[in-house]
Curated annotation (Swiss-Prot):
Binding site for 3-phosphoshikimate: 21-22, 26, 164, 166, 312, 339
Disulphide connectivity of cysteines: none
Subunit structure as annotated in this protein's UniProt entry: Monomer.
Name of this chain's protein: 3-phosphoshikimate 1-carboxyvinyltransferase
Keywords: Amino-acid biosynthesis, Aromatic amino acid biosynthesis, Cytoplasm, Transferase
CDD domains: EPSP_synthase
Length: 423
């Protein structure tokens, strides 16, 4: 499906965004290996999270979905062997986190996914899980499809070469099956939803700076999980309301976990008018309402420990940078190359088609703030984050912008276009 977007004169309104993708995935997985019932409210009905539900069902877990409410009947740590190959669709979170759970089972499981998943690096998970005693056979180059042979696992000390919440979470899930404690050291803190959820479900986790230690032998008990709105989905409205003239948008009940709020910090540093109200804590997660007003932005440099806190938002930050005064430099973001698309390359090439002065670098991009884009036909590369970022670009471009394969937003935000139409 192709979709057309035209320049907007203003954006005004109060909206909610769907449940957080990271928390939705983890609630289903951890609920599945806990004992008793886990009830999840405001679950994200995106394709990726549905892939997680389907995989857990194939492993013998009883899961009931009614609207955005999910009821998981936990089986405890040990699941049933799947009769079929598990298909994770487009979901990197599903395949990487599931590998951690499957490493400690008493059977083997084969995992596959779509073409994008088959191009994404799995070695970063295979290496630490193998050190723990897991046996994993993958396609040459450590790509999916891959087979995980469940085994007795041992605790390890693992120093991660890059900050990745998916890799960290996979090791943490495997650590539940180990004979001794496991310590993970990150170069920078990545999103910590797994640590927070482990604690609320009864696992023993100690966090000391960038070191996370998990202890086996603690029973996980089913919980009630209320999933806050996803800040990665809110990011498109934050940037759009900052750029489009005469705008004021409030986004209700958004997850403002400090490991995820890089987008707010960056837009504020660029000159954005963003106010958080009604701040509270739900299931160990910080939640707030976010109000954004039109602002004039200036270019800045973004890199280092900030990158893991906004890795998924960099494409839409690039759009904001086009309308900032001066130059914006984004560095230390090589991780973007191994997302659903090579996001450094894809956002650069598509914004160039719209007239942006944007240049790809080895680990990021440089954007000259020209304050101008013209409508064109652009490609989403079947990457939901690219499609949504280009939609925001289209709201500011002269003329009409056509986004090809725009339905890929269903991965994380099926009602994305509809929500914008409400403003």
């Amino acid at each position: 499906m192709d979709i057309e977007v035209k320049k907007k004169r203003f954006l005004k309104g109060v909206i909610s965004v769907p449940g957080d993708k990271s928390i939705s995935h983890r609630a289903v997985m951890i609920g599945s290996i806990a004992e008793g019932i886990t009830e999840i409210e405001n679950f994200l009905l995106g394709e990726d999270c549905i892939s997680t539900i389907n995989c857990m069902k194939n492993l013998g877990v009883d899961i009931e979905l009614k609207g955005t409410n999910v009821k998981v009947q936990g089986k405890g740590l040990y699941l049933n062997k799947s009769e079929k190959i598990l298909d994770v669709g487009n979901s990197g979170t599903t395949i990487r986190l599931l590998m951690g759970i499957l490493a400690g089972q008493k059977f083997e499981t084969t995992l596959t996914g779509d073409d994008s998943i088959k191009r994404r690096p799995m070695g970063r998970v295979i290496t630490p899980l193998s050190m723990m005693g897991a046996k994993i056979e993958a396609r040459e180059g450590n790509f999916a499809p891959l087979t995980v042979f469940g085994n007795k696992l041992k605790g390890i000390y693992y120093k991660m070469p890059i900050a990745s919440a998916q890799v960290k979470s996979s090791i943490m899930l495997a650590s539940l099956y180990a004979d001794d404690k496991t310590t993970i050291e990150e170069p920078y803190p990545s999103r910590n939803h797994t640590e927070l959820m482990f604690s609320s479900f009864g696992a023993k986790v100690e966090v000391n700076g960038t070191k996370i230690t998990c202890y086996p032998g603690y029973k996980l008990q089913g919980q009630k999980v209320i999933v806050p709105g996803d800040i990665s989905s809110a990011a498109y409205f934050i940037v759009a309301a900052t750029l489009v003239p005469n705008s004021e948008v409030t986004i209700k009940n958004v997850n403002v976990n400090p490991t995820r709020t890089g987008i707010i910090d960056v837009i504020k540093e660029m000159g954005g008018d963003i106010v958080l109200t009604n701040e509270r804590t739900i299931n160990n997660e910080k939640v707030a309402d976010i109000t954004v007003k039109t602002s004039r932005l200036k270019g800045i440099e973004i890199g280092g420990s900030l990158i893991p806190r906004l890795i998924d938002e960099i494409p839409v930050i690039a759009v904001a940078a086009v309308f900032a005064e001066g130059k914006t430099v984004i560095k230390d973001a090589e991780e973007l190359k191994v997302k659903e698309s090579n996001r450094i390359n894809t956002i650069t090439s598509e914004l160039k088609k719209m007239g942006a002065k944007i240049f790809e670098t080895e680990d990021g991009m440089i954007i000259e703030g020209t304050g101008f884009l013209k409508g064109n036909t652009v490609e989403s590369y079947n990457d939901h984050r690219i499609a949504m970022s280009l939609w925001v670009a289209g709201l500011m471009a002269e003329g009409e912008t056509k986004i090809k394969n725009a339905e890929c937003v269903n991965i994380s935000y099926p009602d994305f276009y509809k929500t914008f139409d409400m403003l």
